[in-house]
């Protein structure tokens, strides 16, 4: 494989020295970019875009072409590709978000679910990873990703998005055996899927536990974190002569960082409700940290964005082990120039904390 021209993202995850704090942004290839909207219109719909490796590559690279400060690319895909490959029938309702034609409601439903083969059943994702790596030609590392078992399970049991997770939590408490069976099958599927991405060329992977923060502390340990640990234990950790770092991100998980740091991932993602300085004091000896600016700051003017970047950099302090990011994904209404101001500020203001 081509040598990396910029590896500061990987170096920071491994807590090796860097010249400036690396930066990327969740949903950096997305609807806030006019070039993304144009490519999506050409594709016809969101899933057609995800399932076309050439177009998925095109939108993955768009933010890098616009923002030379970006230190990583992230695969353009969706966390719900796994349930779709399990036969749940993913589709998108205008204004409603993702929906499934089939809903999981019993142990029999769960036992009937296959564990997808990444090359046979999700080959379009693996092809996209290979295409992106080829086109990146070593510019920056490529991040692969998956949803966490608990997060995927909520969509499969609810039949789509949910505000209160009533069906998922009812299964968790009424029929924990069924929920554990579903989570175990999803953990196997995620492990296989992420290993497929790593073999195809992903140089780091992130597990998005978007809804882990909806759980009680005890339920989080048993029904979310335990299965992320199972995944991390089964991942390929060395590939193509390099360590493949793993990032765990539980939105709303700031209370549980100590437990998360014991799972074996190189880094933890933080949402904006955490103080990054406190997080570093708690777990910074064991893991790198990624985050954690409130995405809504990007609605403010560039001077305010710069001030918030400066505050977060100062809160983290000197040295490596920090990847700057938002605390969740960028929203569609943000001015692309404000994203550019964010990236510029991170590199300009962070040099003083290194070297």
From Swiss-Prot:
Pfam family for this entry, one: URO-D
Pathway given in the UniProt record: Porphyrin-containing compound metabolism; protoporphyrin-IX biosynthesis; coproporphyrinogen-III from 5-aminolevulinate: step 4/4
Primary site of residence: cytoplasm
Keywords: Cytoplasm, Decarboxylase, Lyase, Porphyrin biosynthesis
A GO CC term assigned to this protein in UniProt: cytosol
Cysteines paired by S-S bonds: none
Keyword hit for Mitochondrion: no
E.C. number(s) listed in UniProt: 4.1.1.37
Positions of the record's site feature: Transition state stabilizer: 78
Compartments where found: Cytoplasm
GO molecular function, one term: uroporphyrinogen decarboxylase activity
Presence of keyword Lyase: yes
Binding annotation for substrate: 27-31, 78, 155, 210, 328
Cited PROSITE patterns: UROD_1 (PS00906), UROD_2 (PS00907)
Catalytic activity: uroporphyrinogen III + 4 H(+) = coproporphyrinogen III + 4 CO2
Superkingdom classification of source: Bacteria
One GO BP annotation of this record: protoporphyrinogen IX biosynthetic process from glutamate
Similarity annotation: Belongs to the uroporphyrinogen decarboxylase family.
Biological function: Catalyzes the decarboxylation of four acetate groups of uroporphyrinogen-III to yield coproporphyrinogen-III.
Quaternary structure, from the entry: Homodimer.
Protein name per the record: Uroporphyrinogen decarboxylase
Source organism: Pseudomonas paraeruginosa (strain DSM 24068 / PA7) (Pseudomonas aeruginosa (strain PA7))
